[in-house]
């Protein structure tokens, strides 16, 4: 039985990446050591991390005046690290189109009780269960604000921002955790991008931060571990980084570049792959996708429901027994969610659609 992993993260990794990691696990390139055990100061790892950065820069067309940092703590740590480094003494706006954006705003509010800055909720679609990306009047944004924070892809609700909003000249900070490398963005449109690895980059445990150099604050932070400047100047080696996770990420970057053909080709594949499932849901009067506007639909996370919660539960149980794993929707929204990140096979979407048709026929 073929197993398809629809998990929202940690997610499917490319098979060639896993095979290469397996082949090199005990003896990395005749070093006599595994990457799991080699020093982060060794010449072997120095090449790994530099190659990882170079390939990511090429894939995303990252300009020279941006630093790339590999950090620990997941994207959730960035909810604190961003305002701590960028917003002291200023306003910071938050566009909340999903649960993770709300968490970022909530953490900012919590931090504002400790350091002087003002987090402002710019707009939210929480009142409609985040079924769309909220709009706002850019003239309401103070042009002296530190940044506008947004989440480019909402894993739970299945929405995405593809065209960046007008922010009245205020720099944009983006949580790009769940659609980085799956859609093309112009890095120069952002002051800072951060992304947890466990969707489209690699295993959980490493977070990529891409930050424009003029946003590296000279003021000492509460902790050196939370200071972008210190981390950037140390080349991501201020302390021992998650070496193996960075190594796997490098292999994924190589896969996107050499086997897929780059981000534009990857984005094309994602649009086609997710479109198969969206088209079927649209053609069905049994399944529903809750996203209000088709232009907001995610190419990575596709939530859907049947006519009842009982049928949802039955669907999840039967799907799991057939190898469609982790397809249950997030507890906050229910239903089902098919997360089809970059490494998820197209055949898995086709097989899921076949099962959905069969389930619909048997349960109408």
Swiss-Prot record:
Keywords: Amino-acid biosynthesis, Aminotransferase, Cytoplasm, Pyridoxal phosphate, Pyridoxine biosynthesis, Serine biosynthesis, Transferase. The keyword Transferase applies. It comes from the Bacteria. The modification N6-(pyridoxal phosphate)lysine is found at residue 199. InterPro entries: Aminotrans_V_dom, Pser_aminoTfrase, PyrdxlP-dep_Trfase, PyrdxlP-dep_Trfase_major, PyrdxlP-dep_Trfase_small. It catalyses: O-phospho-L-serine + 2-oxoglutarate = 3-phosphooxypyruvate + L-glutamate; 4-(phosphooxy)-L-threonine + 2-oxoglutarate = (R)-3-hydroxy-2-oxo-4-phosphooxybutanoate + L-glutamate. Pathway: Amino-acid biosynthesis; L-serine biosynthesis; L-serine from 3-phospho-D-glycerate: step 2/3. Pyridoxal 5'-phosphate binds at residues 75-76, 100, 155, 175, 198, 239-240. Binds 1 pyridoxal phosphate per subunit. It is an enzyme of class 2 (transferase). Its cofactor is pyridoxal 5'-phosphate. HAMAP family: SerC_aminotrans_5. Belongs to the class-V pyridoxal-phosphate-dependent aminotransferase family. SerC subfamily. Catalyzes the reversible conversion of 3-phosphohydroxypyruvate to phosphoserine and of 3-hydroxy-2-oxo-4-phosphonooxybutanoate to phosphohydroxythreonine. Homodimer. NCBIfam families: PRK05355.1 (NF003764), serC_1 (TIGR01364). This is Phosphoserine aminotransferase. It comes from Streptococcus thermophilus (strain CNRZ 1066).
């Amino acid at each position: 039985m073929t197993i398809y992993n629809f998990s929202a993260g940690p997610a499917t990794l490319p098979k060639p990446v896993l095979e290469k990691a397996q082949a090199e696990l005990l003896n990395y390139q005749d070093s006599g050591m595994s990457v799991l055990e080699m020093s982060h100061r060794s010449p072997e790892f120095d090449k790994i991390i530099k190659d990882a950065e170079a390939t990511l820069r090429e894939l995303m067309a990252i300009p020279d005046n941006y630093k790339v940092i590999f950090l620990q703590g997941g994207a959730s740590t960035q909810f604190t690290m961003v305002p701590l480094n960028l917003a002291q003494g200023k306003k910071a706006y938050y566009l909340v189109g999903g649960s993770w954006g709300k968490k970022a705003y909530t953490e900012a509010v919590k931090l504002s009780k400790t350091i002087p800055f003002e987090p402002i909720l710019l707009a939210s679609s929480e009142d409609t269960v985040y079924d769309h990306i909220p709009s706002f009047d850019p003239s309401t944004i103070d042009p002296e604000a530190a940044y506008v924070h947004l989440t480019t892809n909402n894993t739970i609700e299945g929405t995405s921002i593809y065209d960046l909003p007008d922010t009245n000249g205020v720099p944009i900070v983006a949580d790009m955790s769940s659609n980085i490398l799956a859609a093309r963005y112009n890095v120069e449109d952002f002051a800072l991008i951060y992304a947890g690895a466990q969707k489209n980059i690699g295993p959980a445990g490493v977070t990529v931060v891409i930050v424009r150099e003029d946003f590296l604050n000279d003021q000492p932070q509460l902790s050196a571990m939370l200071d972008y400047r210190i981390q950037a100047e140390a080349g991501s080696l201020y302390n021992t980084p998650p070496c193996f996770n960075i190594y796997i990420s490098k292999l994924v970057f190589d896969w996107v570049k050499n086997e897929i053909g780059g981000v534009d080709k990857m984005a094309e594949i994602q649009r086609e792959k997710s479109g198969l499932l969206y088209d079927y849901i649209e053609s069905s009067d049994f399944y529903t996708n809750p996203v209000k506007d088709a232009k907001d639909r995610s190419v990575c996370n596709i939530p859907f429901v049947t006519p009842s919660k009982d049928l949802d539960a039955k669907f999840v149980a039967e799907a799991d027994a057939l190898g469609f794993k982790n397809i249950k929707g997030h507890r906050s929204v229910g239903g089902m969610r098919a997360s089809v990140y970059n490494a998820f096979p197209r055949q898995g979407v086709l097989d899921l659609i076949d099962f959905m048709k069969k389930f619909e026929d048997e349960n109408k």
